[in-house]
């Protein structure tokens, strides 16, 4: 079964390898691009590096807002909350991402949909290479 977490126009019928590349780094702002294996930019990530509210905006290649990522530092584990568009309101929460364990040699993340508030079992897993 297919599950569309973000808008369907950003879904591919087959698995796609994507890479996050730092495009420009200044003292106050970091910009990243997400590209496919051919180097085509699929998404852009914009956000302030040094700010009280650690937020990033994910846009498509044309600059249309897709979702907002908000970093929350917790006592036990860091987490990222992902919201629809440019919102950070709880009603627009799509999912939460957190590391599968505190110490990792290879990035492994657990994704919990907003409909899974207890976070006992993750809805998806993401592994880096």
Predicted features and spans:
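Intrinsically disordered, low-complexity proline/glycine-rich segments
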Residues: 1-129
């Amino acid at each position: 079964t297919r599950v569309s977490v973000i808008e369907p126009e950003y879904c591919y019928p087959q698995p796609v390898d994507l890479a996050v590349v730092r495009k420009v780094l200044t003292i106050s702002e970091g910009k990243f691009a997400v590209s496919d294996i051919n180097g085509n930019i699929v998404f852009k990530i914009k956000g302030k590096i040094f700010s009280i509210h650690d937020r990033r905006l994910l846009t498509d290649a044309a600059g249309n807002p897709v979702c907002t990522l908000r970093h929350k530092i917790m006592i036990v584990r860091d987490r990222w909350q992902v919201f629809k568009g440019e919102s950070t309101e709880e009603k627009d929460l799509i999912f939460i991402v957190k590391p599968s364990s505190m110490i990792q040699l290879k990035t492994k993340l657990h994704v919990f949909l907003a409909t899974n508030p207890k976070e006992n079992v993750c809805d998806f897993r993401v592994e880096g290479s």
